[in-house]
């Protein structure tokens, strides 16, 4: 369940993992990181 480019992580772990891996969206600090791109 990858989120789309430009979307924010909605708090779902899979979405935020995808975000971290691809580095194209905003990820929340909930999971110990903050990434935007």
Swiss-Prot record:
InterPro entries: Omega-agatoxin_II/III_CS, Toxin_34. PROSITE patterns: OMEGA_AGA_II_III. It holds the Pfam family Toxin_34. GO terms for cellular component: extracellular region. Expressed by the venom gland. It is found in: Secreted. It comes from the Eukaryota. GO terms for molecular function: calcium channel regulator activity; toxin activity. The keyword Disulfide bond applies. Keywords: Calcium channel impairing toxin, Disulfide bond, Ion channel impairing toxin, Neurotoxin, Secreted, Toxin, Voltage-gated calcium channel impairing toxin. The keyword Iron does not apply. Disulfide bonds are present. Belongs to the neurotoxin 04 (omega-agtx) family. 03 (type II/III omega-agtx) subfamily. Omega-agatoxins are antagonists of voltage-gated calcium channels. This toxin blocks calcium channels in insect central neurons but not at peripheral neuromuscular junctions. In vertebrates, it is broadly active against all high-threshold Cav1/CACNA1 channels and Cav2.2/CACNA1B channels. Negative results: this toxin does not inhibit Cav3 (T-type) channels. This is Omega-agatoxin-Aa3d. It comes from Agelenopsis aperta (North American funnel-web spider).
